[in-house]
């Protein structure tokens, strides 16, 4: 099969990359009613599959799970999760023929096999749903022309999708209709109802395209969301230990530092994160971030180029065909790094200490977020999409590192994200080693002393931070989420 994106002409490619519209609340006035009374069958019961299903059932929809015969016979984890939560479970042959909407929430590498199994069983005029468009865009899966193909992509892990719903809210969500598969013109109605059923309409929904979702998602997860955090963790730990820091303290400063730093990012963007620093430290973090951006820009651009061209996907799919040899080797090597095997620190590190002693880490976050955003926008992706795939998701990924270091991050993210993470981090670590060798006291592991600063310089730095495009669009989107949360709680 041909990569779908590469079959489009340039005008079509740019149009799909640039498709992004923030949808109004009034567009979801009907909630999930379009799907009520219809049969929704979810294939796969992982984190997204289970939690989306729970939300959709609580929204009044008829939800069941189609699993492989062997998963049912052997009572695998997917079968246990579905049955323990009171869902009807059956084989593909038992459930798919009656389904009005089949939602494929299996891992990317299983999509082709799943779609080839369920397509012949789907009734005429049914709909097929995805939460990530890799199978359509990168694999180029051909879907029967009578089938409507839609996407609802929550911009959070499945557990977060459920927790926010239970609080009466939701998570930001992208929705799309595949232009090659909307025979009855009902794709948008299906996608809107599905998004409303998961609670996404309460946090903000972007009408996007399969292409824009895939290309921006791949770029974000490879660079700032996973690759930069992994490279930064390994580099910072080794630097601290080489300069005499207790390995246990160094490990904790990094493991929990990312989460603490990005919590400020979540609440107030790069501006608030930088405002947590003293004035001298802020100036230094800004200078370091500018150096990092200059060094890393070609690497970010290479990843974006390889994503756009399909080079990344073809390489990863070749590894799938080779039993994940590269992926499993990189995973094993990561598990043996000094950071992953360091002892745990039993003492306490105060919240402000993470900022004061993590100036370099803050610079890495700032540089990575801005570079990912800028590179996506330069490639034709709209700012709102670029924001959600860079700054917005970073605190969620940082939280996984706080749980069980890089191991947990790589377990939680998809195999696609993990593969891209390793590609980036394996290139980034040697790239930044000369930069790490030139660091000054106070950049990492110790605080920069208070001292006089040049007012004009501080003014210019503050202006530069606040005027960046990601801060402008981020302020708007975070404000919308706060407004929606207040409305949801009041309701």
UniProtKB/Swiss-Prot annotation:
Protein name, UniProt field: Ketol-acid reductoisomerase (NADP(+))
Signal peptide start and end residues: none
Top EC category: oxidoreductase
One term of GO molecular function: ketol-acid reductoisomerase activity
Gene: ilvC
Record field: catalytic activity: (2R)-2,3-dihydroxy-3-methylbutanoate + NADP(+) = (2S)-2-acetolactate + NADPH + H(+); (2R,3R)-2,3-dihydroxy-3-methylpentanoate + NADP(+) = (S)-2-ethyl-2-hydroxy-3-oxobutanoate + NADPH + H(+)
Domain KARI C-terminal knotted stretches: 209-344, 345-484
Chain ranges of the KARI N-terminal Rossmann domain: 15-208
Residue sites binding Mg(2+) 2 per the record: 217, 389, 393
Binding site for Mg(2+) 1: 217, 221
Gene Ontology biological-process entries: isoleucine biosynthetic process; L-valine biosynthetic process
Residues that, per the record, bind substrate: 414
Keyword DNA repair included in the entry's annotation: no
Residues at the active site: 132
């Amino acid at each position: 099969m041909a990569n779908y994106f590469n079959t489009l002409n340039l005008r079509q490619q740019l149009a799909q990359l640039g498709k992004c519209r923030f949808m109004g609340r009034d567009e979801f006035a009907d909630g999930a009613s379009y799907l009520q009374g219809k049969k929704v069958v979810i294939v796969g019961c992982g984190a997204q599959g289970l939690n989306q299903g729970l939300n959709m059932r609580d929204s009044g929809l008829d939800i069941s799970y189609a699993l492989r015969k062997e998963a049912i016979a052997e009572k695998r984890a997917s079968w246990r999760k579905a049955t323990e939560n009171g869902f009807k479970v059956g084989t593909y042959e038992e459930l798919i023929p009656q389904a009005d909407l089949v939602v494929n929430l299996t891992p990317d590498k299983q999509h082709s096999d799943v779609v080839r199994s369920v397509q012949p069983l789907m009734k005429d005029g049914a709909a097929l749903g995805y939460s990530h468009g890799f199978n359509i865009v990168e694999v180029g899966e051909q879907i029967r022309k009578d089938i409507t193909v839609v996407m609802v992509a929550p911009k959070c892990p499945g557990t977060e999708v459920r927790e926010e719903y239970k609080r009466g809210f939701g998570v930001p969500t992208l929705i799309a209709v595949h232009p090659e598969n909307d025979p009855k013109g009902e794709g948008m109605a299906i996608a809107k109802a599905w998004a409303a059923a998961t609670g996404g309409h309460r946090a903000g929904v972007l009408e996007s395209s399969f292409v824009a979702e895939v290309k921006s998602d791949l770029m974000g997860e490879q660079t700032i969301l996973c690759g930069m955090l992994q490279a930064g963790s390994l580099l910072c730990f080794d630097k601290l230990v080489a300069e005499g820091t207790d390995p246990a303290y160094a490990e904790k400063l990094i493991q929990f530092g990312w989460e603490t730093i990005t919590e400020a990012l979540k609440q107030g963007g790069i501006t608030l994160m930088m405002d947590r620093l003293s004035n001298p430290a802020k100036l230094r973090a800004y200078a370091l971030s500018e150096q990092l951006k200059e060094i890393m820009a070609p690497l970010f651009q290479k990843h974006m180029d390889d994503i756009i061209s399909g080079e990344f996907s073809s390489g990863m799919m070749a590894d799938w065909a080779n039993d994940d040899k590269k992926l499993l080797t990189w995973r094993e090597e990561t598990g043996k790094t000094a950071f992953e095997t360091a002892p745990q620190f039993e003492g306490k590190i105060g919240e402000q200490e993470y900022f004061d002693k993590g100036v370099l880490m803050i610079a890495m976050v700032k540089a990575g977020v801005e570079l990912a955003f800028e590179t996506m926008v330069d490639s034709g992706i709209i700012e709102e999409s670029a924001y959600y795939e860079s700054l917005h998701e970073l605190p969620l990924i940082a939280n996984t590192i706080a749980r069980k270091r890089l191991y947990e991050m790589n377990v939680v993210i998809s195999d696609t994200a993990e593969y891209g993470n390793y590609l980036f981090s394996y290139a980034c670590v040697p790239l930044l080693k000369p930069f790490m060798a030139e660091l000054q006291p106070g950049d990492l592991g110790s605080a920069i002393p208070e001292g006089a600063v040049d007012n004009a310089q501080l003014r210019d730095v503050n202006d530069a931070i606040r005027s960046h495009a990601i801060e402008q669009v981020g302020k708007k989107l975070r404000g919308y989420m706060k407004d929606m949360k207040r409305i949801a709680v009041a309701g």
